[in-house]
């Protein structure tokens, strides 16, 4: 008999929250036992997602949901400040957070890691749950060893509130750590402020926000007489479900915070 993992979703009425909840409700070994959001309060989470009623209504009080529903894992798709508050509350109750929210600083992640270790609870924080995007970051990390310069262009829908994306920042961090030396952008005089994008870990990072986009990123490497472009396109949020399921199924085996889905994969 397959063991069922009890999950509460925070940010359940948002774009990502709804898409992931729909997938979780249709996954055999996952039981969505709670849903938290300030929107759509009192609405059945199944009905909200075009599925048969699930018997789980959206509530505002995470502490109350944890106490009554007894989840093992909390999946969070809110915003950075709320995600951290939710994660701290969950960890204190022995519930393992899986956080897909971006914009959380490394300092705050370290604080969460210390709390998780003290409570002997695992957590996963992943800027991107798409397995294809994780492979894109891995390939970029390896390519950074062989090219003197690179730039990142990330494209997202116009409702995304943070820039650069967590995926772009994570990619830059991986590349800089892989080469173990400062990366330097090409020198250029900006005739218009910001024309060369933001600089992070020595890489120029360009953020595009347009209607019609979902999540896209390319890393362009330049060397003598050649360019290498590594690109990943997410055309539907369904792409995030397999990675999310992987994190949910592994997080209870961890102690402390694992940052990045790539650390749950075998390369």
UniProtKB/Swiss-Prot annotation:
Record's GO cellular component terms: cytosol
This protein's record includes keyword NADP: yes
EC number per UniProt: 1.17.1.8
Molecular-function GO term, any one: 4-hydroxy-tetrahydrodipicolinate reductase
Intracellular or extracellular location(s): Cytoplasm
Pathway(s): Amino-acid biosynthesis; L-lysine biosynthesis via DAP pathway; (S)-tetrahydrodipicolinate from L-aspartate: step 4/4
Reaction(s) the record says it catalyses: (S)-2,3,4,5-tetrahydrodipicolinate + NAD(+) + H2O = (2S,4S)-4-hydroxy-2,3,4,5-tetrahydrodipicolinate + NADH + H(+); (S)-2,3,4,5-tetrahydrodipicolinate + NADP(+) + H2O = (2S,4S)-4-hydroxy-2,3,4,5-tetrahydrodipicolinate + NADPH + H(+)
UniProt entry tagged with the keyword Endoplasmic reticulum: no
Active site: 156 (proton donor/acceptor), 160 (proton donor)
UniProt keywords, alphabetically: Amino-acid biosynthesis, Cytoplasm, Diaminopimelate biosynthesis, Lysine biosynthesis, NAD, NADP, Oxidoreductase
Any one biological process term the GO annotation gives: diaminopimelate biosynthetic process
Protein residues bound to NAD(+): 11-16, 100-102, 126-129
Top EC category: oxidoreductase
Chain residues that bind NADP(+): 39
Database matches in InterPro entries: DapB_C, DapB_N, DapB_N_CS, DHDPR_bac, NAD(P)-bd_dom_sf
Function: Catalyzes the conversion of 4-hydroxy-tetrahydrodipicolinate (HTPA) to tetrahydrodipicolinate.
Name of the protein in question: 4-hydroxy-tetrahydrodipicolinate reductase
Organism expressing this protein natively: Moorella thermoacetica (strain ATCC 39073 / JCM 9320)
